[in-house]
């Protein structure tokens, strides 16, 4: 008789073990922003890239990569939340990774599977692929918590966001 393998995870994966403090630093660098929204997603992405403290060449490069990624598949998770990010982070000439937390006054249609328009975004830009995957995994893990859509809909301040992320990731 064959023994069944225990497939339950006993220890966190390498990505989950990534230090929450590194994500927090990236979120601090990116800041918390309130945008009008209500336009089409390309206009919103142009507005997002305009928030970056980089020259126009880098902003345009990020914009083009965001558009390519979004055309490939929507970055909307559902429940009005999205994580826009370029497909190829290592090609960007960034000084440091950052995550911009954004709340929209008017939602934008990002073609989410649940058909709900997006009102909150966590815009991820990474210097290298490994960190990109780690941050993306951590952000998605937090945003998939059942209480998060309601919490995010209240437009928390940055400290409240950090506390919520810390509770899930630490």
Language-model features: locations:
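Cytosolic covalent-transfer regions centered on His/Cys nucleophiles
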Residues: 1-170
């Amino acid at each position: 008789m064959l023994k069944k393998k225990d497939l339950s995870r006993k220890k966190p994966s390498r990505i989950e073990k990534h230090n929450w403090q590194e994500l927090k630093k990236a979120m601090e660098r990116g800041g918390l922003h309130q945008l009008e929204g209500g336009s089409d997603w390309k206009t919103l992405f142009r507005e997002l890239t305009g928030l970056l403290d980089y020259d126009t060449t880098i902003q345009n490069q990020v914009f083009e990569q965001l558009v390519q990624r979004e055309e490939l598949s929507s970055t909307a998770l559902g429940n009005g939340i999205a994580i826009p990010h370029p497909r190829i982070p290592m090609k960007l000439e960034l000084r440091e990774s950052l995550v911009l937390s954004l709340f929209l006054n008017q939602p934008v249609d990002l073609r989410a599977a649940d058909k709900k328009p997006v009102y909150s975004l966590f815009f991820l830009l990474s210097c290298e692929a490994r960190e990109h995957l780690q941050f993306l995994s951590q952000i998605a893990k937090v945003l998939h918590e059942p209480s998060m859509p309601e919490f995010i809909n209240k437009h928390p301040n940055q400290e409240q966001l950090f506390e919520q992320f810390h509770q899930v990731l630490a």
